[in-house]
């Protein structure tokens, strides 16, 4: 999975890494163990549901306290499942928009001062299929499309202090 590969790349560069997970605790613990076995004390894990405001705030605060600086924020967490138009619900909307759009935006907002201090970077992971659309994934696509728009706006708004980009990898 892409988040793991990103973390391992940063491990190889000797960076400190905060690994966020929602429900994949075992995977997060194994990744942290892998990173810490090569670079002791450089990986921390934090559980948070990006759909819940208080958990996003806690993730921000814990992240600020782990290390002296934050050099990069990679918004890779995502919820992805089909929502055919005849089956959409408020719950689908809240989950898909929460993890794919709202969570990343509020993480950026909460961590921007630490990122400014280090002249850091933000990378938002989007989706290659946004321009053509994907049947049955309209809510997910709307959320990821919103994240692309936020990325463009914040790239201009924060340009003097923080580099903001989006990357849209293909299927993994």
Positions of the model-derived regions?
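Alpha-helical segment proximal to the catalytic Tyr-Lys
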Residues: 113, 156-160
